[in-house]
């Protein structure tokens, strides 16, 4: 009997201890949850009371919207609107300035002759601000070099400034500096100097893709499409996972009027980067040009499913109606 009593008492003690343990664990967890909740509330209050944090978050949101719209050049007006707000909220972010410059350039096609002269200075200003915000970015400096090379003097173009920026790039990366200077020489009409630097860059880093990309564009510019295709094939070989390599190869094929090869290259670029929706529209146009109305109709519909609004979407609807008859 005493044994049974002791067993019951021991059982009660064990259950009581277990309940106390569970209760203590629950209290610890509850305390942790409360602390986290208070921390989140404090973070929220700190966010609400801090214009800097709030503006940075808003700027990031506008930036993302701008970049999304920039995927479709015909939506560049919307991209500009969002990216201008991002820059307004955070003027210290070089990427925001750079992408706003990209949006202005994308808008050139739709700006017309009257607005173009007003857009060019904005491109220059945003690129200069991007470089100021991030002086070690070779991407921003290269974009500024290209502006100085291609813009007329009245809009801020300057070969001297382009070479100066190329010198700055060379201080960061000798290889990229050679390519930048080569591009400036090409713009100046110094083809021999440009080609010499392109070849020197390839020799110094045969496994890097940038020289093949730049040299290919140079050949496109002087109308040597066969040489351009050779360079872009090499570009795609050393950078097979880059959508841009296949796009550039396709672009050269298109200028050579090698349309089946063009379509295959563009499809590969789309496979690697589905956000390149303008290529779907381009493929539809190529099929239409080749006389394949069924595939053209299919690709225009495909484009509309991806981009239901915008200038190009309106054009796609017109094409779908025309090809249906």
Where are the regions that the model predicts?
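Residue-level recognition of tetratricopeptide repeat
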Residues: 67, 102, 109, 146, ...
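Canonical tetratricopeptide repeat
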Residues: 64, 99, 143, 180, ...
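Register position in tetratricopeptide repeats
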Residues: 71-72, 106, 110-113, 150-151, ...
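Structural marker of alpha-solenoid helical repeat scaffolds
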Residues: 54, 89, 133, 169-172, ...
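Hydrophobic/aromatic packing residues within the alpha-helices of TPR/SEL1-like helical repeat arrays
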Residues: 47-49, 83, 127, 166, ...
């Amino acid at each position: 009997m005493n044994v049974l009593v002791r067993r019951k008492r021991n059982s009660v003690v064990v259950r009581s201890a277990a309940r106390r343990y569970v209760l203590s664990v629950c209290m610890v967890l509850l305390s942790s949850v409360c602390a986290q909740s208070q921390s989140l509330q404090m973070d929220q209050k700190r966010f609400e009371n801090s214009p800097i944090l709030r503006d940075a978050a808003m700027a990031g949101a506008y930036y993302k919207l701008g970049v999304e719209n920039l995927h479709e050049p015909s939506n560049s007006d919307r991209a500009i609107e969002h990216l201008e707000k991002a820059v307004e909220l955070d003027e210290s972010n070089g990427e925001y300035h750079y992408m706003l410059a990209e949006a202005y350039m994308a808008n050139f096609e739709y700006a017309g002759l009257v607005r173009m002269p007003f857009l060019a200075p904005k491109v220059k200003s945003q690129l200069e601000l991007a470089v100021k915000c991030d002086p070690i970015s070779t991407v921003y400096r290269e974009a500024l070099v290209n502006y100085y090379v291609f813009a007329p003097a009245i809009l801020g173009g300057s070969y001297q400034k382009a070479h100066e920026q190329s010198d700055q790039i060379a201080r960061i990366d000798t290889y990229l500096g050679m390519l930048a200077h080569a591009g400036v020489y090409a713009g100046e009409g110094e083809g021999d100097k440009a080609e010499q630097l392109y070849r020197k860059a390839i020799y110094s880093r045969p496994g890097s893709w940038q020289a093949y990309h730049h040299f290919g564009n140079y050949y496109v510019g002087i109308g040597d499409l066969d040489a351009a295709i050779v360079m872009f094939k090499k570009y795609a070989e050393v950078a097979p996972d880059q959508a841009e390599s296949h796009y550039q190869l396709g672009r050269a094929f298109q200028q050579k009027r090698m349309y089946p090869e063009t379509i295959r290259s563009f499809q590969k670029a789309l496979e690697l980067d589905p956000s390149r929706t303008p290529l779907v529209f381009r493929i539809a146009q190529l099929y239409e040009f080749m006389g394949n109305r069924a595939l053209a109709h299919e690709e225009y519909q495909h484009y509309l499913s991806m981009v239901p609004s915008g200038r190009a979407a309106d054009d796609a609807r017109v094409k779908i109606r025309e090809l249906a008859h």
